[in-house]
Amino acid sequence: MILSQAGYSEDVIVAGVLHDTIEDTDLTLDYIGNRFNTRIADIVEGCSEEQHGTLPWKARKQHTIEYLKKASCEVRAVACADKLHNVRSMVADYQEQGERLWDRFNAGRDEQEWYYRGLVLVLCNRLNQEPAGSIFHQFKDTVEGLFSRHQAE
């Protein structure tokens, strides 16, 4: 697991495991807070788009980018690990499927690039404070590799 390998605390790791539960299950933040603790529930809440689910794709993603500008270090770490996992999967799928990869998303390649490069700007704006090889460096490098690969073809 990305957060564990990066040396984050147990609370951050647990929040990383639970980060999609509010969006994808019937579990509530109260349940998470009572079952685990309020710090984990707060991190999970910070990673959730649930309250914005009715907005169009681009508006939801713009909200995510704006929110992450002010989010706690823990929320930023969980979000970065989640997005790093997503981009790594996209890279692997791109190697197998090529341009067909983009057909499976609600938004096409250009919109995905806008979103992921926007996330890089927000999540990786403190790279000089991060050790080489951190999840933030890995995320930036993976996003650049995915979208540079596309442009080179």
Language model features: what each stretch is:
Residues 1-153:
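Active-site helical microenvironments for divalent-metal-assisted chemistry
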